């Protein structure tokens, strides 16, 4: 039965998402900004209606977003830079927001003077350009209105999207295509596991480009086409695809949004009462989460290329972990870890680095957060069973990321 989410639950979603997004999903929005956009929507009578998979009409049309966002090399960034970046101590524009339309227009005019002259038929993307992919997909499928959007992953930046759903009158489906975590590639989806067709899809960039993906070999090829587009567009590209409601009910992972809210609510309550947010998270997870390491940050290594951010996180153990070291490799999200140089927790299980005092998960997209000596706790979160199948491991296991490491379930590693 549908549930109307409260302001507290929406704010709790952001904290829960930061704790579950495995270092990815962008950066943490400013707390006051989240409160403002939620309050504005509620003041206008907008409802945040959470529905279960079972409540989706079988013959309805559901949209979901394909996309990738990360980084490109400095040389590529200089050609098509679509944002000022996320390197400021404050977290940069991923947190604060900025006038992207004005920024893109300035960049296009600069390119027009140098290496990319505009044509007589060129059109600069306007403030409504963000809806271009949505509108084109509707045309392709016979102008069918979507009943709702299926969330692709758990991300702290999703709160802005949820507010957008409320303004459009769309319900929030209590489900995702990746479970209760973030993932770096659109191919890492339960829709892929269940062979849901990805075409047609509409892909756009911030530069006014729109492409219809009419046919492709596989989800993996679609993802790599998208990555190529992103690489030569400043690091971001994406757009919607459509699915019939009955297929969403069969293929998506239920309960991911409510699970995230539950985690965030428990952590916020612990912080407000002077308790331990890590213990609160693990208790609220009901057997899904494990305290996997405790220590302090030694360093973070950060590289941008091919539409992603890549690197390593180095942690030095403290307390009961004194004398031990943890290394984590990430591609947007954390995927492989080594305890004292031996394979430890890996994807598809989640690896989350969290500040035990504030309860906020640390974001790989915000390098300034990773201060040397900062105290952290690593919480591992068990993957859903579908990710532990043969096809699931091909998509989210160590070998998908070119690491020849056998996957071992977290519950067999951390007791």
Language-model segments: which ranges?
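C-terminal non-catalytic interaction/assembly regions of soluble proteins
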Residues: 298-415
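Glycine-rich oxoanion-binding loops at beta->alpha junctions
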Residues: 56-145
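Oxyanion-binding "anion nests"
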Residues: 263-318
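A structural-propensity feature for long, helix-poor, extended segments
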Residues: 53-77, 187-229
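Conserved phosphate/anionic-ligand binding catalytic regions in large, soluble enzymes, centered on
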Residues: 13-34, 155-175, 179-182
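Phosphate/diphosphate-binding glycine-rich loops and adjacent basic-rich segments that engage nucleotide
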Residues: 201-266
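Flexible, glycine/charged-enriched surface loops at secondary-structure junctions
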Residues: 233-247, 278-282, 291, 385-392
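N-terminal low-complexity or amphipathic/hydrophobic leaders
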Residues: 11-70, 361-384
């Amino acid at each position: 039965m549908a549930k109307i989410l409260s302001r507290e639950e929406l704010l709790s979603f952001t904290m829960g998402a930061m704790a579950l997004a495995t270092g990815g999903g962008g950066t943490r929005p400013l707390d006051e900004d989240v409160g403002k956009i939620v309050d504005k929507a509620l003041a206008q009578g907008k409802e945040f209606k959470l529905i279960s998979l079972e409540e989706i009409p079988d013959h309805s049309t559901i949209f979901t977003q394909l996309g990738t966002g990360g980084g490109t090399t400095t040389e590529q960034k200089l050609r098509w830079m679509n944002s000022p970046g996320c390197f400021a101590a404050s977290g940069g524009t991923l947190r604060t927001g900025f006038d992207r339309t004005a920024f893109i227009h300035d960049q296009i005019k600069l390119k027009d003077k140098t290496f990319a002259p505009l044509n007589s038929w060129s059109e600069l993307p306007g403030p409504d350009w963000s809806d271009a992919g949505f509108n084109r997909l509707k045309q392709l499928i016979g102008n069918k209105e979507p009943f709702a959007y299926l969330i692709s992953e758990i991300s702290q930046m999703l709160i802005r999207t949820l507010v957008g759903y409320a303004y459009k009158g769309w319900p929030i489906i209590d489900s995702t295509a990746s479970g209760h975590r973030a993932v770096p590639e659109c191919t890492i989806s339960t829709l892929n596991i269940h062979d849901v067709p990805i075409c047609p899809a509409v892909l756009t960039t911030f530069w006014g480009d729109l492409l219809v993906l009419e046919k492709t070999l596989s989800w993996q090829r679609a993802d790599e086409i998208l990555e190529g587009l992103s690489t030569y567009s400043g690091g971001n590209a994406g757009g919607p695809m459509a699915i019939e409601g009955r297929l969403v009910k069969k293929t998506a992972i239920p309960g991911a949004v409510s699970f995230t809210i539950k985690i965030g609510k428990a952590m916020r309550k612990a912080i407000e009462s002077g308790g331990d947010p890590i213990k609160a998270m693990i208790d609220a997870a009901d057997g899904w989460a494990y305290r996997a390491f405790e220590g302090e940050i030694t360093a973070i290594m950060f590289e941008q290329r091919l539409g992603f951010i890549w690197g390593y996180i180095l942690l030095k153990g403290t307390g009961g972990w004194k004398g031990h070291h943890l290394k984590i490799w990430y591609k947007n999200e954390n995927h492989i870890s080594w305890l004292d140089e031996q394979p430890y927790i890996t994807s598809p299980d989640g690896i989350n680095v969290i500040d035990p005092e504030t309860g906020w998960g640390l974001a790989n997209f915000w390098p300034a957060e990773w201060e040397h000596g900062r105290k952290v706790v690593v919480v591992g979160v068990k993957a859903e069973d579908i990710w532990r199948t043969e096809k699931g491991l091909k998509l989210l296991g160590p070998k998908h990321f070119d690491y020849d490491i056998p996957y071992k379930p977290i519950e067999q590693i951390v007791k």
